[in-house]
A protein has these predicted regions:
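Short non-domain terminal segments
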Residues: 9, 16, 203-205, 220, ...
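Extended serine/threonine-enriched, polar tracts that run as long, contiguous segments within proteins
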Residues: 124-199
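Short peripheral tails and domain-boundary helices/loops at the edges of structured domains
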Residues: 194-212
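Acidic, Ser/Thr-interspersed intrinsically disordered low-complexity regions
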Residues: 210-231
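Generic alpha-helix signal with a bias toward terminal, lower-confidence helices
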Residues: 45, 54, 98-101, 148, ...
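Generic preference for flexible, low-structure residues
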Residues: 102, 109, 152, 185, ...
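OB-fold ssDNA-binding interfaces and closely related basic DNA-contact patches used
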Residues: 1-141
Length: 231
């Protein structure tokens, strides 16, 4: 399918379609999401990363996987608009799976059971006082390198691992598939590209006039204590 990126403001839930159930050689099952028969790529608004990159290492295989949580902060209007659309997509997915539950899940399930017990939603409810979040999967190559590309606002390539706690990032994501495991299901949302906003935090060892730094340099780099900076 041809590649087409949809801006979050133009994302029409009613345009989302679903493939037939696909099975792989290992017996795994998946249903692919699309828009007008094209893969569903979505450009998200600028969101805050509450943790930076998260890692998980499987004790059995030793393989490390990566993910990126993004906060749907209530003081971010675009984040709230995205939350509403993703919640609508959650509802559409639940209803579609219910309609096809005998084939996709192996038996008939009602909507309440699917919603409360079987489905892992796109919008993950935060515990008070923390906001809801959305989780992005990060693909790695056979050599362990990150597949998604990350850029600075000057369009220069940067390391994906420069996304740290509190970073603000604009992401292009791919809604890959609905996965089914042990009668539970959810959606894989995979990071494709990330645009990082410059950090407002102090750099490491930000002291002035140390190790040969001149007083003139210190004055030039002085920060007004009354100037407000976003945390």
């Amino acid at each position: 399918m041809a590649l087409q990126i949809t801006h979050h403001k133009n994302f029409d839930i009613e345009a989302v379609g679903f493939s037939k159930l696909r099975k792989n050689k290992s017996g795994g099952k998946a249903v692919y999401l699309n828009v007008s028969d094209k893969k569903l790529y979505l450009q998200l608004p600028k969101l805050r990363s509450p943790y930076g990159l998260s890692t998980y290492t499987d004790d059995t295989t030793g393989k490390t996987s990566y993910s990126l949580d993004l906060s749907l902060d209530t003081d971010n209007t675009e984040a709230m608009e995205l939350r509403e659309k993703l919640t609508q997509l959650d509802e559409l997915i639940i209803k579609t799976v219910v309609e096809n539950s005998k084939e996709w899940l192996g038996k008939k399930f009602n909507e309440a059971v699917c919603r409360e017990a079987l489905y892992k939603p796109l919008v993950r409810q935060g515990k008070e006082p923390y906001p809801d979040t959305v989780k992005l999967k990060i693909l790695t190559s056979s050599t362990g390198d990150f597949v998604p590309e990350a850029y600075s606002t000057s369009r220069e390539r940067v390391g994906l691992d420069t996304i740290t706690k509190g970073s603000k990032v604009t992401c292009i994501v791919d809604f890959v598939q609905i996965w089914f495991i042990d009668n539970k299901f959810g959606v894989t949302v995979r990071l494709q590209q990330a645009l990082l906003e410059p950090s407002a935090k102090l750099p490491s060892f930000a002291f002035l006039g140390v190790d040969g730094a001149s007083e003139t340099q210190a004055e030039d780099e002085f920060v007004d204590e009354d100037e407000e900076y976003e945390e």
